[in-house]
Amino acid sequence: MLEKCPIIALDFSDLASVTTFLEHFPKEELLFVKIGMELYYSEGPSIIRYIKSLGHRIFLDLKLHDIPNTVRSSMSVLAKLGIDMTNVHAAGGVEMMKAAREGLGEGPILLAVTQLTSTSQEQMQVDQHINLSVVDSVCHYAQKAQEAGLDGVVASAQEVKQIKKQTNEHFICLTPGIRPPQTNQLDDQKRTMTPEQARIVGADYIVVGRPITKAENPYQAYLDIKEEWNRIK
């Protein structure tokens, strides 16, 4: 099995913070990074071009959710930036997800966000008025994403096994909310797992933010998580 790299969440507000963070890493260490709303809205497409110029892969995490035509045209624009992965909200429906696939083309990986890892059972039922268990809701969205031709979903590692059962083993599961075993910091994430646990249940990608970006030695923290992530063969 090929060695996998954890995706580093670049949860910064500007380019200066990003460049300072990346200085902790050797230039030959090619990374897979996540650019979210805050950084993208602050710096725009130039941040994509900068990161790509360094040779890193990019997961552009904007979670598009709009009418199909708007999502299609937006994805067409994003495709020109050379991103490697992006996403939409599964709640937008099958037609919107199909439109996203059409706009993005077949190059980048396209994922659907199911339920955020910050969402609890109670919040989902009260705020979203979904009277299912979290895992049933996630699996429902995963099946709809597969129907729409997407490559996979973003979901908690706790739901990965069931997602693979309901779709297939090749359907990608990207899992945020990953925390090393020695950390007690849960922040706003409610459904979390360690890198090793995520690999055991079958996650294909993991996203790690603060345990790396806030570490005293970010590069060593990254290597430790990468080693744990690849421990299960």
From Swiss-Prot:
Glycosyltransferase keyword on record: no
Known EC number: 4.1.1.23
Pathway(s) where this gene product acts: Pyrimidine metabolism; UMP biosynthesis via de novo pathway; UMP from orotate: step 2/2
Keyword hit for rRNA-binding: no
Residues forming the catalytic site: K63 (proton donor)
Keywords annotated in UniProt: Decarboxylase, Lyase, Pyrimidine biosynthesis
Catalysed reaction equations from the record: orotidine 5'-phosphate + H(+) = UMP + CO2
Binding site for substrate: 11, 34, 61-70, 117, 179, 189, 209-210
Gene Ontology BP, a term: 'de novo' UMP biosynthetic process
One GO CC term, this protein: cytosol
Pfam families referenced in this protein's UniProt entry, alphabetically: OMPdecase
An example Gene Ontology molecular-function term: orotidine-5'-phosphate decarboxylase activity
Record-linked InterPro entries: Aldolase_TIM, OMPdecase, OMPdecase_AS, OMPdecase_bac, OMPdeCOase_dom, RibuloseP-bd_barrel
Cross-referenced SMART domains: OMPdecase
Record function comment: Catalyzes the decarboxylation of orotidine 5'-monophosphate (OMP) to uridine 5'-monophosphate (UMP).
Family: Belongs to the OMP decarboxylase family. Type 1 subfamily.
Oligomeric and partner information: Homodimer.
NCBIfam families with a match to the protein in the record: PRK00230.1 (NF001273), pyrF (TIGR01740)
Protein name: Orotidine 5'-phosphate decarboxylase
Species name: Streptococcus agalactiae serotype Ia (strain ATCC 27591 / A909 / CDC SS700)
Gene: pyrF
